Amino acid sequence: MGQSPRKYQAEALSVIWWALKNDDFDNIVVQAPTGIGKSAIAMTVQDRFRNAYLLTPTLGLTDQYRRDYGSKMKEVQGRRNFACWARSGTADGAPCYKKKKKCRHAEEDDPCPYYEQKFAAEKARLTLSNPSYMFRVTQSQAAGFEQRDLAVIDEAHNLESFFLDLL
């Protein structure tokens, strides 16, 4: 946390540490009001794991994590956020994606901006992304993003509507 946790953060962390030591818990949900410091709690918890994903569904939260903890993580964004070096337009229309053609910029020795951030995020101890991107990557069984020891999903109460929107 960088500084001593506030009372409610310390209480939440105490319960989380207890639950993590107890093998009966696969999922832990922290529900607390805005401003309590859930992001700081999440960052403290992930520090105890070898590697983790941090998923947040909103740009506001992504910006907050990037601003407050950017040096501790690598962010990965979807292709539409990057220009394609093989043709005009964004990388979501790239031949290597749309037509599954081989592209020299999809290799680690000369990556385009999309692949550069993707390769860095794959190797990072902590990767920041959004549920939509990670769901699509894992569903497509794309190489690179392997299972991690921990997944922190900020705003997890919105996951049901997120998955319903995919149908």
Residue spans for each PLM region:
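Alpha-helical elements of the RecA-like P-loop NTPase motor core of helicases
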Residues: 40-43, 63, 136, 161
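A substrate-engagement module of RecA-like helicase motors
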Residues: 3, 28, 50-127, 132-135
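Hydrophobic residues on the short alpha-helix immediately C-terminal to a glycine-rich phosphate/catalytic loop
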Residues: 16, 45-48, 65
